[in-house]
From Swiss-Prot:
Name of this protein: Protein transport Sec1a
Stored Pfam families: Sec1 (PF00995)
Keyword Protein transport appears in the UniProt entry: yes
Function: Involved in the vesicle trafficking. Binds syntaxins.
InterPro entries for this protein: Sec-1-like_dom1, Sec-1-like_dom3a, Sec1-like, Sec1-like_dom2, Sec1-like_sf
Region (Disordered): 538-591
Length: 673
């Protein structure tokens, strides 16, 4: 029996291609865990047993085919009834909880164990008393092939993103009287443990920075409490073999108070539009396609995943740009077919739908055409929704508010002339308005606005609940009035400034989430040390190295390039046209995204991690991908959950509903089940 932690490094080693966060996680599960159990008889099949948490970890990193390739013939859940298989070995990937240990001992003790031998891997640090509990059973000890801490209790949801799976973090930590609930501290402790396993798994020791509290309110102290808990966990990992003793990366901990607009504004990228406007379940969507037999339309499930090169290329592009590129791809395919050339002899341009029908008839391009047709369907559906709901005008007003180009008259005029606008869209507009112009919601002003928008009292509560995240109000609202104060010291009515040096190629593409600005300041050393404190203050040299990423081998520049500011009007870049042709490469234009991804990032500086308490957005994930290219440092986004606007609004509603505290989260559906 061995009791140890994995000893491999996460930095890609030996001059090979750089390995991103999710790839490292996948490799550790498949090779360090499953692969390490192979004995002389490498062809012998094994059983993999997991609990409700570790099955999520596995399903977010690996496909069932990957697991089978490692010699796993059966995957089972720890607490479900299982058939005895005394002739086979079992691999346990479980949390180090008392309940799990009791169940494991029940499986392997006595004269007739369920399995021949057990290899046990824990998702996080196992307490000594539980180790002693295992060792105390003399019948089990000879049947244990390995006993290790994998330190993987996070859920990779992207090549550069992970979750702690705390869907209810917002209401558990920020709701009314949240600090008086026992769930408050339980949530923070589990969250800290899971975040810490990220650094244990990657063998990284971070500078832990966090948003400083502006008051003594418990909800305002959440980032500092989480930072302290994470640092306490990470400090204990220094005993792990090969774990760094000095800082190797950056961790920035913030909550939704730093940016309450990103979760609700209409983001115009293909990825964000799919999840905002379509009926998505996770990364899946069902569409109707023509029947191949001539019958009624058939339902087809679409999965948007990293294995799809078209999705990887288009996901972070503007929806209009994505639509143009899809049309170009269809045209290229159609040009290979004589029927297409004949149909276009009259000089008329073929529509994307016509091109789709033509390329579907090309058998030699079956899989590529299928992927392409899928995205044509999705983009077409999104564009129809944009047109039918008048979303362009609403999106323009939203961004004008954020950048200080619109005010009360514009909002009132929009609400008066667009009474049939979707109630949720009107609510999102007023939430943005309240963030930029909080004084417009003081007294009965907010009530009148909500009445003009024909929104319900429940919707009014959503806006007032934003204050619970922003901080405690100085004065309680008088009975029957509506009050909101996000920033009493605000003088300039703009929530964002146009970024100098960045040309707006597409209309409605001005908006950027605040973490982009925060991370750039962090790298340049300009992040306010009073607003963002550090748990582990070190020497100036070490801190400078962490900012520039000089410890990890990299010849590429790691700081943010200086931008030459040019005078411009915020309104001067607008156009009456829906979209303009792109004039420069935006970083997503290659048709060989999968191939170039591995070669482009052979050398990167030190990693930067940013963790957002209360849910992250598609735009924030996009920024992490963008900054990885511009900073030449992998930026990894972590959060308690990944929320689309409707989900976030629902969570805001629950902040004032006391009966939801401690309610069970939505069931998780593994991707390979």
């Amino acid at each position: 029996m061995s009791f140890s932690d994995s000893e491999s490094s996460s930095h890609g080693g030996g001059g090979g291609d750089y390995k991103f966060f999710r790839q490292i996680s996948r490799d550790r599960l498949l090779h360090e865990m499953l692969g390490s159990t192979k004995t002389g008889d490498s062809k012998a099949w094994k059983i993999l047993i997991m609990d409700r948490v570790t099955v999520k970890v596995m399903s977010q990193s690996c496909k069932m085919a990957d697991i089978t390739d490692q010699g796993i013939s059966l995957v089972e859940e720890l607490f479900k009834r299982r058939e005895p298989m005394p002739g086979m070995d079992a691999i346990y990937f479980i949390q180090p909880s008392k309940e799990n240990i009791v169940m494991f001992l029940s499986d392997m003790s006595g004269r007739e164990p369920l399995y021949r031998k057990a290899f046990i891997f824990f998702s996080s640090t196992i307490p000594k008393e539980l180790v002693n509990h295992i060792k105390s059973d003399s019948s089990v000890l000879p049947r244990i092939g390995a006993l290790r801490e994998m330190n993987m209790e996070y859920f990779p949801i992207d090549n550069q993103g992970f979750l702690t799976d705390h869907e209810q973090a917002l209401e558990t930590l920020y709701a009314e009287d949240a600090e008086n609930s026992r769930h408050f501290h339980i949530c923070l402790n589990i969250m800290a443990t899971r975040i810490a396993t990220v650094f244990a798994s990657l063998k990284e020791l971070p500078f832990v920075r966090y948003r400083a509290a502006k008051s003594t309110a418990s909800r305002d102290l959440v980032p500092s409490k989480l930072a302290a808990a994470i640092w306490d966990c990470i400090s204990k990992y220094k005993a792990i073999p090969n774990f760094p003793q000095t800082e190797t990366c950056e961790l920035l901990i913030v909550d939704r108070s730093v940016d309450q607009i990103a979760p609700i504004i209409h983001e115009w990228t293909y990825d964000a539009m799919c999840h905002d406007l379509l009926d998505m379940e996770g990364n899946k969507h069902v569409i109707e396609v023509p029947s191949k037999t001539g019958g009624p339309p058939e339902k087809k499930e679409i999965v948007l995943e990293d294995h799809d090169p078209v999705w990887l290329e288009l996901r972070h592009t503007h929806i209009a740009d994505a639509s143009e590129r899809l049309h170009e791809k269809m045209t290229n395919f159609a040009s290979k077919n004589k029927a297409a050339q004949m149909r276009s002899r009259d000089g008329s341009e073929l529509s994307t739908r016509d091109l789709q029908k033509i390329v579907q008839a090309l058998p030699q391009y079956g899989e590529q055409v299928d992927k392409l047709s899928t995205h044509v369907e999705l983009a077409g559906k999104i564009n129809r929704i944009i047109r039918d709901t008048g979303l362009r005008d609403l999106g323009q007003l939203e961004q004008d508010l954020v950048f200080g180009d619109a005010g009360a008259k514009d909002v009132i005029n929009f609400l008066r002339t667009n009474q049939d606008t979707n109630p949720e869209n009107k609510l999102r507009l007023l939430m943005i308005y309240a963030t930029v112009y909080p004084e417009k919601f003081e007294g009965d002003k907010g009530v009148k606005l909500m009445q003009l928008a024909r929104l319900s009292p429940v919707d009014m509560k959503v806006i007032s609940n934003m204050q619970l995240i922003a901080g405690s109000p100085e004065n309680k609202a008088k009975s029957g009035s509506f009050s909101l104060k996000f920033d009493a010291g605000k003088t300039k009515q703009a929530n964002r400034k146009d970024r100098s040096g960045e040309e707006e190629t597409w209309q409605l593409f001005r908006f950027y989430p605040m973490i982009e600005e925060l991370l750039e300041k962090l790298v340049k050393g300009d992040l306010s040390k009073s607003d963002y404190l550090c748990m582990n203050q070190s020497s100036h040299k070490e801190e400078s190295e962490a900012r520039t990423g000089s410890v990890r081998k990299s010849s590429a520049p790691t700081a943010v390039p200086e931008r030459k500011a040019t005078p411009h009007s915020m309104r001067s870049r607008r156009t009456a046209t829906w979209a303009r042709p792109h004039s420069s490469d935006d970083g997503y234009s290659s048709d060989s995204v999968l191939k170039s991804a591995s070669t482009e990032f052979k050398k990167l500086g030190q990693r930067i991690f940013v963790f957002i308490i209360g849910g992250a957005t598609r735009s924030e994930l996009r920024v992490c991908h963008k900054l990885t290219s511009s900073l030449r440092r992998e930026v990894v986004l972590g959060s308690t959950s990944f929320d689309d606007p409707p989900q976030y609004i629902t969570k805001l509603k629950l902040l004032s509903e006391k009966d939801i505290q401690g309610a069970p989260a939505q069931p998780f559906k593994p991707q390979y089940w």
